[in-house]
């Protein structure tokens, strides 16, 4: 299911994937738009702001990492954002997910996040995809966006998304595991071939090299950025329960079971770390979207 929250824009809309028809939320005349985002214009320049307003970004996984990335996109005037997640907000999400409030428990994550985003930026067109990405539907859901933020922990789907994106030349940034870590200053962005201390990304990388023909030479880069932490993992004490499993609705036939957001997966987690993962991913995307076209850059 897909819902969209559009608002007036003078920018031509890019050709996006063929998503289902969407619900429209009309926004009132917004006279203070430039006051809202004047800080963005002063930072990135008028041309940079225009690029952000015209951009389309897809966030896959609206959990402890992806919800914060989506928040950053909205607060930086990105014009079109697609949110993809079939999960619903659970009490156990409260410690790390921005939309996890008392009156939101049980709601679809994409719906709660979309409503929040249009309150921040009434001109943002937010498309809600209440579904999981699978190897079978990823082209339909992801194709046509200017950038994709991978904030999921499904190894199979991560492999399929990254393999497809690299093969067809789609820009994507992938996020590693955010659980079991205390120090947000250890979070880094490097080429995906260079990550360390991240079992999730290591497993994905190994399969991409083995089954997708990605470079095995450690000196060769993949050309895809990854957000990860080089902090050694902190394991829970034996008497501590692992993560609750009340976050996962029954998957649709053919879909991957369980939630796809970067869950703690048995580790403890802190918003002081998970939020920084999302913000770092978003900041990398914003930098790429606002970079001047090399062909038109002054000599």
Residue ranges and their predicted role:
Residues 1-58:
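N-terminal charged helix/coil linker that caps or initiates catalytic domains
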Residues 2-3, 146-147, 152-272, 276:
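E1/E1-like adenylate-forming module used to activate ubiquitin-like modifiers
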Residues 25, 78-121:
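Glycine-rich phosphate-binding loop and adjoining beta1-alpha1-beta2 segment
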Residues 54, 141-144:
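Alpha-helix C-terminal capping/helix-to-coil transition sites in glycosyltransferase folds
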Residues 59-61, 84:
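Conserved N-terminal Rossmann-fold NAD(P)-binding element of oxidoreductases
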Residues 129-138:
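Conserved SAM/SAH-binding loop
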Residues 210, 275-293:
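Internal hydrophobic alpha-helix adjacent to the cofactor/substrate pocket in enzyme cavities
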